[in-house]
Amino acid sequence: MMAGDMKPGKKVVVSEFAEDPLQAIDAHMSLQDMARPDPATLKAGEVLIAIQSASVGWVDLLMTSGQYQHMPKPPYTPGLEYSGLVAAVGAAVNPASVAVGDRVLVDGLQVGPRSLGDYQSQGGFASYAVVPDTAVHRIPSTLSFDQACCLLGNYETAYHCLIARGRLKAGETVLIHGASGSTGLAAVHLAKLVGATVIATGRSDDKLALVKAHGADHVINTRAPDGATGVRRFRDEVKLLTGGRGVEVVYDGVGGDISLESLRCVAFGARFLIVGWASTPAVAQGRGQRGAPNANVLPTNLIMMKGLDVLGCPMVIATVNDPTIRPPRFAQIMQWAADGRITPHVSHVYPLSEFKTAMRAKWNGEGS
């Protein structure tokens, strides 16, 4: 798209924090008109993006109610990760790095709701965005726009957790919870890349079939029997699959009862990776009030007796605290993508006008 081809567009706006994401979707988010961008207003190092695709992530949902640890200031446009075409560039942008017409993905750690500073309000649920050239990266030819906007957040999280923190290596077995979600599938991909055996869990046979098709060696449905609460006992299956030894690594993005049962599935000295708590999304109060009324708790007796390393894995916070950890991680992920060794899974595609349907689908676990 050239600058002269641009027309007025649309953007989604979160007007204020809600009590929970569903309330935000229903009452505090709207699709608003967006003026035709004027390339003449770009600063020297800025890039104008004609957005083609934006992913809907779990974090996007939690941010709308102020229940994520980082809270953008409303009003803002959601959409942590997005991709598009370069429509115009500022006078100081190096054409060797990015040029008009390039297919690019935008770094959600530098711009958009998860960032700090001048570009925080400009998320990807919009027709256009203006970003600094340092936040723009050419999309590998192996990926579509839809796939590209599902790359960095998912695979950087999985890399930080499994490889940097978990020290997963060839020959080990990893138990991956929430494997049918976008970050869980990325974890399956990376675990197989390093040569590990993957036991993946989920609550839907259909979704677990997809996880198996993406490389998991074994899958376990943890849904409790009809009429029962929590999760069903799966320690015996894991022990059987590991010759009675248990797994060396647990990748836990679910929390709650899954975490407790997983403590019975580990080998002595295993690494237990805390990635998230999808089973208890209201771990913080709504409307940005903080607090932890539903905090997950792990029994310290089992942690001690099994000699576990319990590791918190906040990819973004760790990167902010030590930016040097990111360049090698970023380069490796981009190289794997360019080589066709990792390909993000896209389960659903919606037009921007159906953003509420897309966000409800994510909340209800209807897609990856």
Q: Over which residues does each language-model region extend?
A:
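Short, well-ordered loop/turn sites that connect or cap secondary structure elements
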Residues: 97-99, 168, 266
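Adenosine-nucleotide cofactor-binding segment
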Residues: 176, 192-261
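Hydrophobic/small residue at the entry helix of a nucleotide-binding pocket
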Residues: 157, 182-183, 257-258
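Glycine-rich phosphate-binding loop and adjacent beta-alpha segment
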Residues: 194, 257-342
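N-terminal Rossmann NAD(P)H-binding glycine-rich loop of SDR-like oxidoreductase domains
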Residues: 180, 188
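C-terminal hydrophobic helical "lid"/dimerization subdomain
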Residues: 1-7, 321-368
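NAD(P)H dinucleotide-binding glycine-rich loop of Rossmann-like/cofactor-binding domains
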Residues: 106-178
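Glycine-rich beta-strand-centered segment in the early N-terminal region that forms part
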Residues: 37-56, 67-113, 140-143, 253
